[in-house]
């Protein structure tokens, strides 16, 4: 059908993203689905999706998000629900920048000079309000771009969010993301590595 379209439309069709459900991608989606349906408890399972650059990690996450977005909107038209929240780790992984990225992802206004405690409370309240069931943090390897103390603070933030929200956290990144998580003993045993 696309071959019968005008040149511009065919070119646009060829350049568009395509989902190619190779075996490892399908099994990763299945694992994400298991986490999505996990009942809330004190210590939730987390996942660390590891793969080389241009290996389809972000495409898998976007497909997972799309698969859950329309259901939430259709069933709750009067209240916005965001069951799968996807945020990218900032290039400089400070706690305040991460909260700012999360708030922007949720479409929330933010005071430019808000303190971390304020950002934290607003973010937690919003994530609960939109009934987030899973938090995906893409480009987690960016954590290594920070100085040692900034890196530790960011990794502590991941542990805090997991404890506070009681939802699974999925980290996505290159092997450097695995090295970052392994640098914290408590986080290492909370994140199940999944190699693509």
Predicted features, each with a name:
Residues 41-63:
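Walker A/P-loop nucleotide-binding motif
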Residues 66-77, 108-110:
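Post-Walker A helix-loop "phosphate-sensing" segment adjacent to the P-loop in P-loop NTPases
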Residues 139, 171-177:
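A short beta-strand-to-loop transition that corresponds to the Sensor-1 phosphate-sensing loop
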